[in-house]
Amino acid sequence: MCSIGEDDFGDEGATHAMLPGSSTVGTVITAGSCNKCGLNSLELYKLNFRAAECHQCFLSYARHKFRAALGAAKALPRNAEVLLLVDGSAESLVLLDMLHFAQTQNTFKRLHCSARVLHIDAQSSPSENDPLPMLNELRERYAPFEFYVIQLGAEVHSLKLLKDYSASRLDSTDNKLRSLTARQDYVRQQRKRLIGAVALQLQCTHVFEPSISSSLAAQLLTSVALGRGGSVALDVALLDDRLQGAVTLLRPLKDLNEQEVQFYIKAQQLKPFRSDESSLLSDASLQNLTSAFVANLQLNYASTVSTVFRTGDKIAAKRQPIEEGPSTCALCQSDLDSGLSDTLLAIEYSRAVSEMGVALQQQNNMEALEQRARERLNSMDNLCHACRNIHAELTHGSLI
């Protein structure tokens, strides 16, 4: 039993509470000797729990994590066609730089694959910063990669090369959803569907997603809270095979943390230009609050975030038995969880009570109430539980 009582929390605050550990900021030392190669350097990078390293030793360490993630699981076959997602975030630029470096090495060390770069334009208003100038700078720096752009919500045939792209106004379904939580979840699923369609269009067999440990920890908690527990393992795993057309999504930066990403940005003088989700953290949604919670943990208790993230590696993905045949959600492509279960029935029962209200008291018919709950559970049987929750927030129109 816990021996800490209320008296232990006096005017001095939580005396026995967990104390903040190492921050994620790290230290850049102006000059000194590298603890790994022994050479003098004008700038040393001091990561938490690692000795100070010179510019080249740090880059070798970070790039090894990228190569090790792909090599340990043998997830990327030789001469694979890869679609790399660049959204302007720091981690996406790090992944782009690492992949370009791996492709420009000698034959022995070269990563043997062909890469194309995709940017999904999700600007909701013309007043937002135009990403095209920054993308053109990246195209020149990382030649000969081909850069493609497509608008979120557009048809796949509207995919354009960066040099030929011009934005147009589209009618967005997410504006028809009542809550910000539902809108953000829908945009995430819509984005995944579009990525899979573009990969098929460009004949790419693999997609590189720039997710790091802290973002995957936030995604794990968010998926559980949204009712996606059956597919949470694939949401944070190195390999996700739910995209259409047997396209495989890979997360080769999953072992990098925020501190390593920021040091890499500084070392390579990269310029992130994304300001979308991170700027919305003041708006209340389940995703934003979870991200803020994990960011605070990462700042004060970095090892706790690692524990949350590593939990995802121990969760097995829920799969349909082979004899039952494939049965996936029409929106998120996860295995359907809409079978009759006590938990889902209880949720729909509660909703039915709220809907019937006074009529329930007048009729006093519990059988009708349970029948109503079963009908709700069996309706939209092509959607999983979480995607049905999105549909419930839809004011008009259709999700798909």
UniProtKB/Swiss-Prot annotation:
Cellular localization per UniProt: Cytoplasm
Pfam families given in the database record: CTU2 (PF10288)
Pathway(s) where this gene product acts: tRNA modification; 5-methoxycarbonylmethyl-2-thiouridine-tRNA biosynthesis
GO molecular function, one term: nucleotidyltransferase activity
Domain of life of the organism encoding this protein: Eukaryota
Hydrolase found in the keyword field: no
Cellular component GO terms held in the UniProt record: cytosol
GO biological process: protein urmylation; tRNA thio-modification; tRNA wobble position uridine thiolation; tRNA wobble uridine modification
The keyword Disulfide bond is assigned to this record: no
Keywords attached to this entry: Cytoplasm, tRNA processing
InterPro entries linked to this entry: CTU2, Rossmann-like_a/b/a_fold
Family the UniProt entry places it in: Belongs to the CTU2/NCS2 family.
Task of the protein: Plays a central role in 2-thiolation of mcm(5)S(2)U at tRNA wobble positions of tRNA(Lys), tRNA(Glu) and tRNA(Gln). May act by forming a heterodimer with NCS6/CTU1 that ligates sulfur from thiocarboxylated URM1 onto the uridine of tRNAs at wobble position.
Name under which the protein is recorded: Cytoplasmic tRNA 2-thiolation protein 2
Source taxonomy: Eukaryota, Metazoa, Ecdysozoa, Arthropoda, Hexapoda
